[in-house]
Amino acid sequence: MSQRQQAATKKKPQRTCLGCREVRNKNELVRIVRTPEGEVIVDARGRANGRGAYICSNAECLRKAVRTKALERALKVEIPEAIIESLARDIEQ
């Protein structure tokens, strides 16, 4: 198999949205990270250090992930309401 064929058949990483539980390509989802310092942020580039979780880029999936506490379980941290509102604003942008 040539290098060109390998590049064409290369698999893209798949991740599951915490809100709707739909499996999508990693680059279609938004990564939320708990940094080593304990801060919860939206990782736009997908390269921040820390424990990550993925959701679709819509507010409904974030609401569902928060309501079911899936986001807190995935990040292993309690998330204050102020941070959730900040995440919602970041995702909408």
Where are these regions (language model features)?
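Short, conserved beta-strand segments within well-ordered enzyme catalytic domains
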Residues: 31, 41, 54-56
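C-terminal structural segments of small proteins and small subunits
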Residues: 63-93
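N-terminal first-folded block
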Residues: 2-38
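A short beta-strand motif that forms part of the nucleic acid-binding face
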Residues: 34-36, 46, 60
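Cys/His-coordinated zinc-binding microdomains
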Residues: 21, 57-62
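Processing junctions and N-termini across compartments
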Residues: 11-14, 50, 55
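Short functional micro-motifs and their immediate structural scaffolds
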Residues: 25-28, 61, 66
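Short linker/helix segments within small regulatory modules
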Residues: 38-50
